[in-house]
């Protein structure tokens, strides 16, 4: 029997025995307010706990086959129930040799490495670190088509930004090859025909495929974020010390659980060097299921000079917690975003949005406004400075920002955000929006 299930049944029975009058009440689960977060025993009964699947049976494929609401409900239950007595221990740490990745070479080739050989491979690259260095830590396995596509879009976008050659077509499946003339590429071609100037620069891209070392939900939930972050942080220290890569040009990006790994890596870098990385970007950071006892973990503002986060499934695979200097919530905090049919697609939209903003000419595709709810944004009652989500985010932005996105690519609306009439405040409590469908409590 699932040990989580056994323990949580006992906990729920105890809650019922204590006579909690709100037991079984789910009326608040569609609220996007962060006040008075419900206890698990208030809305999960023992029968439902018994029906939870074994953790090894929960896969990205199964989550992708569920509706957005079904997948989010399952993850909600697993998360809340996991908090009883720290059921999940963060004890899954893939060996550095198991975590593979690649450097994108000048000719578009993949220069493969594992974490043990990363620094040596970088040393062999001419002019590495002369300009920007972007390190993307992928948080979910690329065996999933949604993850694979989002990662490919991000890599292609940086190839354009850094004037690198595209991958050989043999790197992609037939279905992917047929999609190469997507709306994003067509948009770039139209700009070139109109004589618009690309805002490109040189740089280097490293992809760390942490997600490929995660095989099931049990490993996902028990990922040792602290240890993995320390390992990657130490590699960053080696890059600055032995390859002379200045920390001021390093941009660390993490998707899903890797967003928290990136945060720890930033802190480890600071502990070892006394300096901070320039920027960390979190692409739909997840809830943390396995937490070390009596110790804070995961991403937080202060892990780099500037930390920004894009939340596309705040009540699905992601989290509604404010983790960064500026937190962006496309269409407000909710289970998913327009056009996303399941929780996997919803969480990967953050990567797709960021990739779109990286493409030359698209840097300001995602205008946003500081607001405390989607309803407030729609009624032009937001407050403060307008800003852009994505690669062009201003480093002086703070607080919660909301914007509208399209359901299909191009996702950015590219038009100025609505003028707002309120006053600027930082990280205000969420205000409930009755029109914000699919949202739930964390």
UniProtKB/Swiss-Prot annotation:
Record has Phosphoprotein as a keyword: yes
| Molecular-function GO terms, alphabetical | serine hydrolase activity
Residue numbers carrying Phosphothreonine? 170
Q: What happens when the gene is disrupted?
A: Viable, even in combination with null mutations in Yp1 and Yp3.
**Compositionally biased region (Low complexity):** 21-33, 175-186, 431-442
Major place of residence: secreted
One annotated Gene Ontology cellular component of this protein: extracellular space
Q: Where is the composition biased (Polar residues)?
A: 34-44
Q: Which family does it belong to?
A: Belongs to the AB hydrolase superfamily. Lipase family.
What name does the UniProt record give this protein?
Vitellogenin-2
Gene name on record?
Answer: Yp2
């Amino acid at each position: 029997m699932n040990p989580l299930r056994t323990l949580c049944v006992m906990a729920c029975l105890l809650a019922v025995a204590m006579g909690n009058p709100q037991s079984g009440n789910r009326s608040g689960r569609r609220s996007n307010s962060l006040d008075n977060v419900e206890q698990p025993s208030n809305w999960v009964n023992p029968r439902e706990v018994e029906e939870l699947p074994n953790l090894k049976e929960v896969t990205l494929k199964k989550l992708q086959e569920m509706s957005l609401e079904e997948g989010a409900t399952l993850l909600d239950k697993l998360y809340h129930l996991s908090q009883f007595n720290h059921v999940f221990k963060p004890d899954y740490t893939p060996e550095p040799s198991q975590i593979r990745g690649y450097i994108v070479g000048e000719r578009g080739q993949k220069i493969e490495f594992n974490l043990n050989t990363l620094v040596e491979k970088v040393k062999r690259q001419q002019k590495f670190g002369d300009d920007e260095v972007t390190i993307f830590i992928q948080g979910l396995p690329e065996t999933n088509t949604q993850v694979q596509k989002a990662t490919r879009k991000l890599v292609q976008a940086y190839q354009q930004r850094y004037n690198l050659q595209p991958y050989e077509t043999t790197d992609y499946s037939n279905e992917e090859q047929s999609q190469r003339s997507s709306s994003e590429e067509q948009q770039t071609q139209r700009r070139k025909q109109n004589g618009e100037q690309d805002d490109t620069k040189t740089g280097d891209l490293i992809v760390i495929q942490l997600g490929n070392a995660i095989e099931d939900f049990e490993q996902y939930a028990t990922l040792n974020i602290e240890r993995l972050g320390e390992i990657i942080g130490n590699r960053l220290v080696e890059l600055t010390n032995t390859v002379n890569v200045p920390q001021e040009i390093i941009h660390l990006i993490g998707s899903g659980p890797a967003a928290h790994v990136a945060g720890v890596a930033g802190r480890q870098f600071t502990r070892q060097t006394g300096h901070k990385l320039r920027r960390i970007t979190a692409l739909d950071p997840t809830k943390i299921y396995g937490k070390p006892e009596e110790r804070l973990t995961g991403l937080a503002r202060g892990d780099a000079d500037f930390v920004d986060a894009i939340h596309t499934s705040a009540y699905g695979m992601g989290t509604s917690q404010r983790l960064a200097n500026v937190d962006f919530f496309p269409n407000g905090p909710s289970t998913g975003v327009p056009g996303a049919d399941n929780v996997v697609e919803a969480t990967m939209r953050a990567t797709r949005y960021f990739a779109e903003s990286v493409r030359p000419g698209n840097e300001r595709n995602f205008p946003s406004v500081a607001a405390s709810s989607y309803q407030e944004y729609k009624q032009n009652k937001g407050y403060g400075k307008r800003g852009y989500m994505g690669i062009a985010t201003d480093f002086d932005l703070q607080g919660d920002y909301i914007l509208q996105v399209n359901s299909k690519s191009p996702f950015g609306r590219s038009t100025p955000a609505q003028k707002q009439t309120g006053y600027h405040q930082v990280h205000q409590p969420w205000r409930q929006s009755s029109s914000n469908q699919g949202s739930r409590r964390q």
